[in-house]
């Protein structure tokens, strides 16, 4: 049976071209009609194929979707929904880009001259003050660092009893409370708040300090913290920070209006070494009572080389303050200027990835006008001041020999570190302190010595 479409086309062609049909032979006409029929059949086949594709596509997910089974596709969709909900919740709670870390270092200290030995942890700095045998030893800290979408950083570190704010006399748990705000780009920032001092090669945190104790320059010649505002600039390998701030004071007392300028410049020469320098210039409180704030100038240069198993670090410092010497002029009684200079060097070598030995040597020259360091007067526990001969029987005040010359100090520390795991380090240190004057008090019998011995141990745990 012939196709009705074929018959209709035959009649149409015959009607439209009667003269051509008569001129052509029957055989030629049949060839043309067969060709036309084949073409029509091809069009019909293509139409059927196009109608069958949507049905096949609709049935495909029942068997597979993107190379997954239906169950796998359902699990994937469920995970995607939960992930989006978790991201929304994290952002709503303020936890996005929030880093929480912390550390603690329960310690044991033996001090020969103080006739003291025992564990040391979270002792209040108000009970006995700041000394080289307690400083930031036996602390705990919680660190919160939050960065917003725009690049602003909010930094809060809490450390009870022995934080920087407690050391400067406020008694709070604040160690750092600062903000860093980008100005135009992330390499130019405004910094403000309460910031620990950044001078020297040694860091405040026990996680970044190889020994249990700190060097002489860290303890006696550097500021504790700044409260103020300034800029931080990053330009290639250079990082510069400068602030206009109160030094060691969260608020200026009545009658004081002059802040200090504090700055720090670091240069990373390469992967293994670098150097930096820091300074403080301006009026600050001194260790002589009743003088108020006087002009202070501090400057130090430090550097490091860390490659393979070796670590080398060093620092040279100079400082001086007006009317801050321990002893006044013997003739006029007028207060005189204090001045000091010193250096510290540290070398460490790892015999294995876990086992490290450390040696540190410090020297501090402080002989001018009976001595006097940053915030320190005569101190028989720290070994600062002129020759000490005893104490007054009635008042207990120190008695001095030659008051014109203060003691120069040295300290040698030898230590061992053992990295128990990625978060735990055991430290052991022996330290020998010496002075060229009798400035260390032996509390057992009340005599004075030129030297002291200290043994310290701690376990530093961080997360």
Q: Predicted regions span which residues?
A:
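Gram-negative bacterial Sec-dependent N-terminal signal peptides
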Residues: 1-22
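N-terminal periplasmic/intermembrane-space "pro-region" immediately following the signal or transit peptide
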Residues: 13, 22-119, 391-393, 397-398, ...
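A general secondary-structure boundary signal
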Residues: 24-25, 32-36, 40-54, 83-84, ...
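Acidic-residue sensor for enzyme active/binding pockets
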Residues: 28, 32, 44, 51, ...
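Generic alpha-helical hydrophobic packing signal
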Residues: 28-32, 44, 151-152, 186-189, ...
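Outer membrane beta-barrel
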Residues: 86-249, 255-262, 266-275, 343-369
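Outer-membrane beta-barrel pore domains
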Residues: 126-129, 166-167, 273-463
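Short, small-residue-enriched loops and turns at beta-alpha junctions
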Residues: 249-251, 284-285
């Amino acid at each position: 049976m012939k196709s009705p479409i074929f018959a209709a086309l035959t009649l149409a062609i015959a009607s439209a071209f009667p003269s051509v049909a008569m001129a052509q032979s029957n055989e030629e006409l049949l060839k043309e009609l067969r060709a036309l029929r084949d073409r029509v059949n091809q069009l019909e086949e293509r139409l059927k194929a196009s109608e069958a594709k949507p049905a096949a596509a609709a049935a495909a997910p029942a068997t597979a979707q993107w190379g997954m089974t239906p169950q796998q596709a359902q699990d994937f969709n469920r995970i995607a929904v939960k992930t989006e909900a978790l991201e929304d919740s994290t952002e709503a709670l303020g936890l996005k880009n929030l880093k929480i870390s912390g550390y603690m270092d329960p310690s044991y200290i033996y001090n020969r001259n103080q006739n003291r030995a025992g564990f040391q942890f979270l002792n209040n700095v108000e009970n006995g003050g700041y000394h080289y045998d307690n400083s930031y030893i036996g602390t705990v800290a919680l660190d919160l660092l939050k960065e917003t979408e725009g690049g602003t950083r909010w930094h809060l570190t809490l450390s009870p009893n022995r934080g920087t704010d407690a050391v400067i006399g406020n008694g709070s748990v604040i160690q750092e409370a600062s903000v860093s705000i980008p100005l135009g780009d992330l390499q130019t920032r405004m910094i403000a708040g309460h910031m620990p001092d950044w001078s020297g090669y040694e860091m405040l945190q026990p996680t970044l300090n190889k020994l249990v104790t700190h060097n002489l320059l860290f303890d006696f010649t550097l500021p504790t913290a700044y409260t103020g505002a300034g800029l931080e600039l990053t330009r290639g390998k250079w990082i510069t920070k400068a602030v206009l701030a109160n030094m060691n004071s969260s608020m200026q007392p009545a009658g004081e209006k002059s802040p200090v300028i504090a700055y720090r410049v670091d240069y990373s020469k390469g992967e293994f070494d670098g150097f930096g320098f820091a300074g403080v210039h301006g009026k600050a409180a001194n260790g002589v009572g009743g003088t108020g704030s006087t002009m202070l100038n501090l400057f130090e240069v430090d550097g490091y080389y860390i490659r393979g198993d070796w670590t080398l670090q060093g620092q040279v410092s100079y400082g001086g303050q007006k009317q801050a010497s321990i002893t006044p002029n013997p003739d006029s009684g007028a207060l005189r200027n204090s001045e000091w200079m010193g250096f510290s060097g540290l070398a460490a070598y790892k015999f294995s990835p876990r086992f490290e030995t450390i040696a540190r040597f410090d020297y501090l020259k402080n002989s001018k006008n009976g001595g006097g360091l940053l915030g320190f007067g005569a101190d028989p526990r720290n070994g600062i001041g002129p020759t000490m001969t005893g104490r007054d029987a009635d008042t207990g005040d120190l008695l001095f020999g030659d008051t014109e010359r203060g003691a120069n100090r040295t300290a040698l520390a030898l230590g061992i570190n053992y990295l128990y795991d990625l978060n735990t380090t055991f430290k052991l240190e022996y330290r020998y302190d010496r002075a060229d004057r009798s400035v260390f008090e032996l509390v057992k019998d009340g005599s004075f010595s030129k030297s002291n011995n200290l043994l310290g141990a701690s376990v530093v745990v961080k997360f």
